[in-house]
Regions:
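Structural motif
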Residues: 130-134, 194-195, 305-309, 357-361
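Active-site phosphate/pyrophosphate-binding segments
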Residues: 245-348, 460-462, 466
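Short, surface-exposed connector motifs at secondary-structure boundaries
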Residues: 119-128, 297-302, 351-354, 378
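N-terminal export/assembly segments and adjacent metallocofactor-ligating motifs
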Residues: 1-282, 288, 533, 540-546, ...
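A cross-kingdom feature strongest in bacterial/archaeal respiratory oxidoreductases
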Residues: 43-44, 144, 153, 192-195, ...
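Non-catalytic, well-ordered alpha-helical segments in soluble enzyme domains
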Residues: 433-459
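A conserved amphipathic helix/loop scaffold
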Residues: 271, 422-435, 440
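Short acidic (Asp/Glu) and glycine-rich catalytic loops that position anionic groups and cofactors
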Residues: 236-242, 268-269, 296-300, 326-329, ...
């Protein structure tokens, strides 16, 4: 209880000097007529994510944000949020967050502007960016301007938990980078392939909401209407705990399994894929009956796969879903052409003058094969922009403190492409910076004011009334238009990814998964998240290696 009390104490209850933003929301130099002490005022904004900005409504008391809830105006989520969104407000008041940059505010602005002048001469040949993925159209516009000004620069994006494998697989077999948006409210039969879509997936808020609609049984007459969930997974998850039929299988064997499902459904598979399917010795009856059930519910059956699985697995899943006429919509998305591997390659060449890292913590969570810490040290200058004084910040030559999303202007898109604003609830508690300002100064554009940049982007996209956009918390009807998957070519996939290895106590498969407490590590200092029990193990304030009792005895 003492720890929880400490969490509440630092969540704004003991903070002083809290100020409202100077733009749009009135400052408290004089008591506004519509503000009554003890009566909350609500504002809309959204929590930025790699691929999904979550629309929220924030409760404020006397200028201080104190509670985050979902925005009911966004119908796919129905006013719901994730536990991460609920706890994100605590990070605003975290006394351990980066409260200032390693140099003065003026010096930071001068240094960012100097990057523009320095690299205009070499076309950006010595300039490398490593950024976390973002849905912001304003950031995308600034990135395009940076690429135009510095054609030789490298723009790479990296997320410790990559959720874009299915989109890359779609591009591989169809030529278009497509995001699948399943409609579980129309699905009667579901096969989940190592995918915890009820908890740890993009848009899991909406997916879970649609799924439970098909699981409600009021009396015996409704039993036939209830959906059926098949779950094949490597560890027990929230999704697996809800399954009607569950099969335990290692992640590395999922490729051979889905190839067997495809063959059982009569899908035309390349010879190499059929060969890979034969590499897995599994209960043939389970595969046969699962495939038959999916086929019997054509138009109302779908398969979803975990994003950690190889592209070849997702390619077969896409092909099967097309054959089943699954209730899935596709929207076209854009992914960065370069990733962390390209950034490391450029750094190892030894001629990078300036490295700009926007968020994340690659020194801590980049794959060990890349040895990011060594590569980062090879840059003439490394600039880290982020909210935490983490391992990457400490290894950088310059640290630029970032504002919390409740302190800043921005924009973004939800998982289905709906445009949403990011607006401040409070003036920055510390002398921190906005990502849009950082990029604008490097790009050398006319204005570096984030509010003006966001408003201009909104106008360019034909948004209409900007104030209504801020009030509603979204632009109605701005979701991405669905597209058809016109062709699927499985001959281009790497069938070797599908071959199932022989596993034993002496040849183990190890999976690193996202923590229910800390995500990819960014919530490690969030007391609320650490207090929240893991849905399966019930662990709090801890982590564990999960192995079976049998393996534990053998080891």
């Amino acid at each position: 209880m003492k720890v929880m009390a400490a969490s509440f104490g630092l969540a704004g209850l003991g903070m002083t000097g809290c100020r409202c933003p100077e733009q749009v929301i009135l400052p408290y130099s004089k008591q506004p007529e519509n503000v009554i002490p003890g009566v909350p005022i609500y504002y809309t904004t959204s929590q930025p994510g790699d691929r999904d900005n979550v629309p929220v409504i924030v409760e404020t008391q006397s200028g201080r944000p104190i509670k985050v809830e979902g925005n009911p105006s966004y119908s796919p989520y129905g006013g719901a949020t994730s536990v991460y969104t609920q706890a994100s407000i605590l990070d605003l008041y975290d006394p351990d967050r980066a409260s200032k940059s390693s140099i003065s505010e003026t010096a930071v602005r001068d240094r960012l502007s100097a990057i523009n002048k320095t690299h205009l001469a070499d076309g950006g040949k010595g300039l490398v960016f490593l950024a976390e993925p973002s849905t912001s159209p304003s950031r995308a516009k600034l990135v395009a301007q940076i690429k135009e000004s510095f054609p030789e620069a490298t723009w790479a994006e990296y997320a410790a938990i990559d959720q874009s494998t299915s989109e890359k697989a779609a591009k591989l077999i169809s030529g278009k980078s497509l995001r699948s948006i399943p409609d579980f409210s129309k699905a009667k039969r579901i096969l989940s392939l190592d995918a915890d879509f009820l908890l740890n997936a993009d848009a899991s808020i909406g997916l879970a909401r649609d799924f439970v609609k098909t699981r409600k049984v009021k009396d015996s007459k409704d039993s036939g209407k209830m959906s059926r969930l098949y779950s094949v997974e490597s560890s027990l998850t929230s999704t697996g705990s809800m399954a009607d039929h569950r099969l335990r299988l290692s992640s590395s064997q999922m490729g051979a399994f889905i190839a067997q499902i495809g063959a059982a459904l009569g899908l035309s598979l390349p010879a190499a894929v059929k060969y890979a399917a034969a590499s897995l010795d599994i209960d043939a009856k389970w595969v046969k009956e699962c495939a038959a059930d999916l086929a019997a519910n054509k138009n109302h059956a779908l398969i979803i796969a975990g994003e950690h699985l190889p592209q070849s697995v997702h390619a077969i899943v896409i092909a099967i879903n097309e054959a089943l006429s699954a209730p899935i919509n596709y929207i076209e998305v854009s992914n960065a052409e370069s990733g962390i591997s390209e950034a490391v390659a450029r750094l190892n060449e030894g001629d990078v003058k300036t490295l700009v890292i926007l968020g994340g913590n690659p020194v801590y969570n980049a794959p060990v094969d890349f040895d990011w810490a060594t590569a980062q040290a090879k840059a003439g200058e490394s600039i880290y922009f982020g909210t935490d004084k983490n391992e990457t910040a400490k290894a950088a030559s310059l640290m630029v403190a970032a504002s919390h999303y409740l302190e800043t202007w921005g924009d973004g898109r939800t998982f289905d492409g709906t445009l949403v604003p990011v607006q401040p609830m409070i003036e920055p508690l510390f002398p921190t910076f906005n990502e849009l300002e950082v990029l604008a100064r490097i790009a050398g554009v006319g204005t570096t004011d984030a509010y003006s940049i966001v408003q201009a982007t909104f106008t360019e996209q034909g948004g209409g009334d900007f104030n209504k956009f801020l009030s509603d918390g979204l632009l109605e009807g701005s979701n991405s238009k669905t597209v058809k998957l016109t062709s699927v070519d499985l001959s281009v996939i790497d069938a070797s990814e599908l071959t199932a290895p022989a596993l034993s106590a002496s040849k183990l498969e190890v999976r690193f998964t996202a923590s229910s407490h800390t995500g990819d590590g960014r919530y490690a200092n969030n007391g609320w998240m650490m207090e929240c029990p893991d849905p399966m193990t019930k662990l709090t304030w801890d982590n564990a290696i999960m192995i079976s009792p049998r393996l534990a005895k053998e080891l």
